């Protein structure tokens, strides 16, 4: 049985060296809300020896034009590069686990000879705040 989950996606990239961390974070949130599959940054050396950031956006082809507009509107870049890339993913599913603190979602990921389980951060953070515990204490107690 084949476990391969690979698809071709578009990757949009741009360089920025004159945005604050807050501005870049806001841009990333806005890009995700506009339909990006993934948004991440890579630290890079820019021209004139400036530290900068490469903003990377993975998307479906039909979202590309919209996302380019969102990138230009929310960053200081003057150019966006486009690449085709292969994206390999594990199969994902969720299950609800009953705990002494209420229901918690658990993400199950598998494929390529790997199986993983991970509790959802938002649920753990909620319990930690409600119970006055650290995230590590919550993980250990459930």
Q: Which residue stretches match the model-derived regions?
A:
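Long, contiguous binding/interaction regions
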Residues: 18-58, 62-79, 84-142
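Glycine-rich phosphate/diphosphate-binding loops and the adjacent beta-loop-alpha structural elements
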Residues: 11-19
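Intrinsic-disorder/low-complexity, polar/charged segments enriched in Ser/Thr/Lys/Arg/Asp/Glu/Gln
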Residues: 9-11, 54
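Short, small-residue-biased leader/transition segments that mark boundaries at the very start
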Residues: 3-8
